[in-house]
Amino acid sequence: MPAQTIEELIAVIKQRDGHMTEFRQAVEEVVDSLKVIFEREPKYIPIFERMLEPERVIIFRVPWMDDAGRINVNRGFRVQYNSALGPYKGGLRFHPSVNLSILKFLGFEQILKNSLTTLPMGGGKGGSDFDPKGKSDNEVMRFCQSFMTELQRHVGADTDVPAGDIGVGAREIGYLYGQYKRLRNEFTGVLTGKNVKWGGSFIRPEATGYGAVYFLEEMCKDNNTVIRGKNVLLSGSGNVAQFACEKLIQLGAKVLTFSDSNGTIVDKDGFNEEKLAHLMYLKNEKRGRVSEFKDKYPSVAYYEGKKPWECFEGQMDCIMPCATQNEVSGDDATRLVGLGLKFVAEGANMPSTAEAVHVYHAKGVMYGPAKASNAGGVSVSGLEMSQNSVRLQWTAEEVDQKLRGIMRGIFVACRDTAKKYGHPKNYQMGANIAGFLKVADSMIEQGCV
């Protein structure tokens, strides 16, 4: 029997996926927001239960040879979650932590995120427990070629369009696309995040970071303030954090921190364009650590083994967690509120724990959840798909303008939906309800499939 009540739905989740910690956390957060919908219209409860099951989960081995001639084996995944709105769309993550729970959580979030963009994209996610760190270019290439040799059977421009994520940047996308083209003998938009020279879109590398800042800007406007002059703590130092910093500098905010898995750098004077350029060189070309930033700028403080939320001292206004899931704890959130935290715009996927989100709401912090605030990346991926389908390439200015419009539309949907259901300024609830209803109604209209 399908679940008919909220209690039965929660029991089903615990029974089927109780061991999948990250997935359960993501689902329970959404269920909490959707209770108001389920109480008004119980017909949506069995639809949500059906939505929890991926349409398809593909697991495969990835054998590859290292530079010493040894055969290594990693595990590859693709979770094709929901295609009610369009082809499966979502990134590939290469990281030792990758498992089915993490990919199901990311794929589930991707369904709602893609729905919010209003672009015709379903939800999916994939990756491998392969770690590109410490590997030579040739080793990464051989792994990517082996990975795509199996994945190519399951993807396509009208079926499933992967992109990058943690551990999958421009280099990896290039190797993956080259192998797909070699095997299928077709030049098509099967991946997004491609180089602009061969089918990519301008602003795609910048899109997630830029989009999160645009969402933060809209939150500020909605609360009668401006982003200019705000002190912002960033975590991470990869693609998302770098371009969030770039846009924050352009809009007049002050960025005070960056981090990686080893520690955090704090610059009380704020990062300017020159400092950001050096950080980009360290991370993108030298593939170094943020601790090396201190070699050129000795006035910067470095905190070994610390996150920005644990070591920053001083007045601040906003945080943009751009590293990984569950990086901001309830204790971190409480500490940040004491330092003046007023706005959170998430650049990473689910970077705040449930306890941290509870603190945000309890203390009146304006919270932009990942599925809304970091949707810029997949939005421009959708625009890349559109450009590929008609063999056109828009200018950077055109894409940035479209991105800003999409992020504005996402914010308005979150704001208006939250207000409609009696929870004004609860952008998290607005995002969950608006994203869910579009997918759920589409599933109802398409029948039992």
Swiss-Prot record:
Question: What is the originating organism of this protein?
Answer: Giardia intestinalis (Giardia lamblia)
**What's its catalytic activity?**
L-glutamate + NADP(+) + H2O = 2-oxoglutarate + NH4(+) + NADPH + H(+)
- Xref: InterPro entries: Aminoacid_DH-like_N_sf, Glu/Leu/Phe/Val/Trp_DH, Glu/Leu/Phe/Val/Trp_DH_C, Glu/Leu/Phe/Val/Trp_DH_dimer, Glu/Leu/Phe/Val_DH_AS, Glu_DH, Glu_Leu_Phe_Val_DH, NAD(P)-bd_dom_sf
Assembly and binders: Homohexamer.
Which processes are annotated in GO (biological process)? glutamate biosynthetic process
The answer to keyword Phosphoprotein applying to this record is no
UniProt similarity note: Belongs to the Glu/Leu/Phe/Val dehydrogenases family.
UniProt-recorded Gene Ontology molecular function terms: glutamate dehydrogenase (NADP+) activity
**Pfam families to which the protein is assigned, alphabetical:** ELFV_dehydrog, ELFV_dehydrog_N
**Catalytic activity, EC:** 1.4.1.4
Q: Which cysteine pairs make disulfide bonds? A: none
Name it: NADP-specific glutamate dehydrogenase
Spell out the coiled coil positions from the record: none
Taxonomy, top ranks, is: Eukaryota, Metamonada, Diplomonadida, Hexamitidae, Giardiinae
Extract one GO cellular component term from the record: cytosol
Q: From which domain of life does this come?
A: Eukaryota
- Which residues carry out catalysis? K125
Per UniProt, the keywords (alphabetical) are:
NADP, Oxidoreductase
